[in-house]
Structures are given as structure tokens and as C-alpha cells.
């Protein structure tokens, strides 16, 4: 067993439960076969393509032993390619996704400075253009056949009509029909627009957001972004912990990010943050001077449901639609009261203008010292 594999197996991140799908198992077997053949260099383009669409090789949220085995062979190859290249920028452009992955893995595994690939993060690479597949005509062959029949029918009808210029009476009738159709269409459009304007938009409810207690198992600094931490957080998913990028470097030392309970927003759309896909967000309270974690009550467990009072029985959305701006509409109502409890404050709600963030036991969630905080 190599030193890198041994080092990986000593990390907490290697102990996460892994349950591969059939597709992921096939991917792992494919790369194992490539490694056994000793011919990984011809597969570098394929590896770069895989890492373009995934953070790690087997489409997981965190590295697996497959990443370590492939990394061990790919690192010296890429080092040689970069060192011998007459056009380093071109090499970086060609293998940009492998380089991002190598940078993360070598920092995770604490590769020695002699073996480490020194990556130029200031190199200005051209924008990557990804070709989109052309959509096939809807309906395929059936539509093509129907169109052919329609063309034949039109041709036959055309031949049935006598050739030559229509008389004036016919032209007048056609003009009147066209005018009437245009007026009817305009009236229908105006009616539809008026109905849409009169229809009040449905107000999103805070129950749409999937708040959960999370446990940060491990956090490291993002290899490509000085302001970001990359945390592995257990939020109770059967698939295992999530990878979460947080811009908290300026506010918390790395030690404060280890093995602690937090509140996590779990249904925002995943976002790529400097090459690493972030699949959730840590909830914090802040003012102009400082940032503080929203602290779960004592004896909380990873995966515990968190909600605002009155919405405990409602299920959150699977994923918030960014186009509908649900988070942007609700978040400004999140704040803290004088007792430092996180609340949802909406003065338009006459019956319940204030709702506390709570759990199934009715306990409060607080920040350490900031009243009237922005919570996000």
C-alpha cells in the first residue's frame, strides 16, 4: 500500500459511508482497469472531461480511494507535461480541470514540497467553450412523416384550386378575415396580460426552506480561494455528508470550524465555487462588526429538522428555484430579537408577525451576542 493511500485512510474524510450507484461502480472499475494497464497518459483527456463535470472522479461529493490511486499516477505525468511544455498556458488550458483536482488532492494529502506541483493561480486562461448538443426535432420520425403528409396534402389542395389572380370580391373577403383574426388575437393577448397583472403573486412561505442541524466533521482551506473554507458536513442524508464552501475565513479560525454543530440550508441550488461544488450553506448571524454561527440547542443531532414556528408540519421544497427568488424574498425577514433568538419577522402578518426558529422540542436557536442581526 502506498504512502498516499495510507495517509488518505488516516483522514476522517475517508471514513464517510460510501454507497455507489451502478454507474459509479462502473466508473471506479473503469479507472482501476486503466491503472492496471499502466497506460493512463492516453486517458488524460478523458480524465479532464470527467473532472469538468464532477468535483471528483466517481461523481461523489468527496474524494474516494479511486481519486487517490489515479492522483498518485497522474501527478508526476502532469508535472512532466507542465515542466517540458513550451507553452505552459496552453497546457493549463488543456488540462485545467485535472490541475484543479490535483491542487485539491495534493493539499488534502499534504504532498511534500518536492513532489508537489506548483500551480500558477495567476495565469489568465481563455474562457472554456462547451459545445451544446443540438436538439433533435420534437417527435422524430413520426413528426417528419406527418410533415411529409401535410406537404403532399397542401400540394394537392393547391392543384385543386384554379390558377390565376383571385377576383376583387375574393380579395376583399380575405382581407376582412385577416383583419378580424388579427383583432381577435390582439384582444385575447390584452385580456391575458390583464389577468396576469390582476393575479396577485403567491407569497412564498418560510417552510419552503430546508433548514437542518449539521455537524461539521472536517474543514480545510479551499486550495484555490483564500477566503473560503471547504467543510464536510453531516446533515442526515442517506448518501452521506455534503461538501460545503463557506466564506468564513476572515471571521473564524480553522480550529473553530472543526467538529461542531451548525444550522445548514440544504435546498439551495448547488454552486461551483472555484472548482468545488458546494451543496449547502451554513447559517450565520452578522452585523457590521462580526459574524456568529447560529447555534443549535444542546443535544441536537445531525439531520434534525429546523423550522419557523407554525410551519413544523410542512415539508420544504426539494430545491429552491433561483428564478423564483424564494430565498431572496424570505431571507431579509430573518433576524434576531433582544434575546438573541433567530426569528422570522414579517409585519404584514397581522396574526403572527414574529416566528422563532425552532425544532420538534420547541427549543430556540441563538447567536452568541448580536441582536437585530442579519441572518443568512
From Swiss-Prot:
Region entry Disordered, spans: 133-206
Keywords in alphabetical order: Cytoplasm, RNA-binding, tRNA-binding
N-terminal signal peptide: none
Region (Interaction with methionyl-tRNA synthetase MES1): 22-46
Composition bias type Basic and acidic residues, residue spans: 146-180
Record-level GO cellular component terms: cytoplasm; cytoplasmic stress granule; methionyl glutamyl tRNA synthetase complex
Protein name (database record): tRNA-aminoacylation cofactor ARC1
Amino acid at each position: 500500500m502506498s504512502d498516499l493511500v495510507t495517509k488518505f485512510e488516516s483522514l476522517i474524510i475517508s471514513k464517510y459511508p460510501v454507497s455507489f450507484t451502478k454507474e459509479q461502480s462502473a466508473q471506479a472499475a473503469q479507472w482501476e482497469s486503466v491503472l492496471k494497464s499502466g497506460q493512463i497518459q492516453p486517458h488524460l483527456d478523458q480524465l479532464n472531461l470527467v473532472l469538468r463535470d464532477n468535483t471528483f472522479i466517481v461523481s461523489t461529493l468527496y474524494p474516494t480511494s479511486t481519486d487517490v490511486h489515479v492522483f498518485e499516477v497522474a501527478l508526476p505525468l502532469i508535472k512532466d507535461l507542465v515542466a517540458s511544455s513550451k507553452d505552459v498556458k496552453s497546457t493549463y488550458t488543456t488540462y485545467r480541470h485535472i490541475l484543479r483536482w490535483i491542487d485539491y488532492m495534493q493539499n488534502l494529502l499534504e504532498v511534500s514540497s518536492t513532489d508537489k506541483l506548483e500551480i500558477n493561480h495567476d495565469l489568465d486562461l481563455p474562457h472554456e467553450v462547451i459545445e451544446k448538443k443540438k436538439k433533435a426535432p420534437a417527435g422524430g420520425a413520426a413528426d417528419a412523416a406527418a410533415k411529409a403528409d401535410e406537404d403532399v396534402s397542401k400540394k394537392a389542395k393547391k392543384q385543386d384550386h384554379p390558377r390565376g389572380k383571385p377576383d376583387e370580391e375574393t380579395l376583399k373577403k380575405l382581407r376582412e378575415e385577416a383583419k378580424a383574426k388579427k383583432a381577435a388575437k390582439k384582444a385575447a393577448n390584452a385580456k391575458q396580460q390583464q389577468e396576469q397583472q390582476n393575479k396577485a403573486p403567491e407569497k412564498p412561505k418560510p417552510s419552503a426552506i430546508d433548514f437542518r442541524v449539521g455537524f461539521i466533521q472536517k474543514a480545510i482551506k479551499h486550495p484555490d480561494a483564500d477566503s473560503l473554507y471547504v467543510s464536510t458536513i453531516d446533515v442526515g442524508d442517506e448518501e452521506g455528508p455534503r461538501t460545503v464552501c463557506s466564506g468564513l475565513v476572515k471571521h473564524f479560525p480553522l480550529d473553530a470550524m472543526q467538529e461542531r454543530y451548525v444550522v445548514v440550508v440544504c435546498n439551495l441550488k448547488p454552486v461551483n465555487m472555484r472548482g468545488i461544488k458546494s451543496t449547502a450553506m451554513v447559517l450565520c448571524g452578522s452585523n457590521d462588526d462580526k459574524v456568529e454561527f447560529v447555534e443549535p440547542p444542546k443535544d441536537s443531532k445531525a439531520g434534525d429538522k429546523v423550522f419557523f414556528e407554525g410551519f413544523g408540519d410542512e415539508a420544504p421544497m426539494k430545491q429552491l428555484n433561483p428564478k423564483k427568488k424564494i430565498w431572496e424574498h424570505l431571507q431579509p425577514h430573518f433576524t434576531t430579537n433582544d434575546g438573541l433568538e433567530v426569528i422570522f419577522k414579517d409585519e404584514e402578518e397581522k396574526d403572527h408577525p414574529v416566528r422563532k426558529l425552532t425544532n420538534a422540542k420547541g427549543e430556540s436557536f441563538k447567536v452568541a451576542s448580536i441582536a437585530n442581526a442579519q441572518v443568512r
